From Swiss-Prot:
Gene Ontology terms: cellular component: extracellular region
Residues making up the signal peptide according to the UniProt record: 1-22
Disulphide bond pairs: C48-C63, C55-C72, C62-C88, C74-C86
InterPro entries listed in its UniProt record: Spider_toxin_CSTX_knottin, Spider_toxin_CSTX_Knottin_CS
Protein name in the entry: U4-lycotoxin-Ls1a
Keywords: Calcium channel impairing toxin, Disulfide bond, Ion channel impairing toxin, Knottin, Secreted, Signal, Toxin
Tissue expression remark: Expressed by the venom gland.
Protein's job: Enhances the high-affinity desensitization of human P2RX3 purinoceptors.
Propeptide: 23-44
Keyword match Nuclease: no
Domain comment (free text): The toxin is composed of 2 domains: a highly rigid N-terminal inhibitor cystine knot (knottin) domain and a rather flexible C-terminal linear cationic cytotoxin domain that forms amphiphilic alpha-helices.
Lineage: Eukaryota, Metazoa, Ecdysozoa, Arthropoda, Chelicerata
Superkingdom to which the source organism belongs: Eukaryota
Amino acid sequence: MKVLVLFSVLFLTLFSYSSTEAIDEFDSDAEDDMLSLMANEQVRAKACTPRLHDCSHDRHSCCRGELFKDVCYCFYPEGEDKTEVCSCQQPKSHKYIEKVVDKAKTVVG
């Protein structure tokens, strides 16, 4: 009986060792495949429109500020013809929140 228990423990040890070898081999192949796919990946991000620049061509292209994304505001200037002018601007509420966060960072550390 002791011999049977000894052989079963030995068999289970060898089986678990061989299965982990196979799993490690499979994982390394999967990692190599993923790395080769990532190497072929192209950067798809388009250039953002800086603050206070014209965003009439794409109203969702404004750059991010420190915490929030700027918003494209459109308006009609006074005294000119009825052409719409759009520019990326930071909303006042976002500006105040960023100031509070900056003050909190300096106080905390």
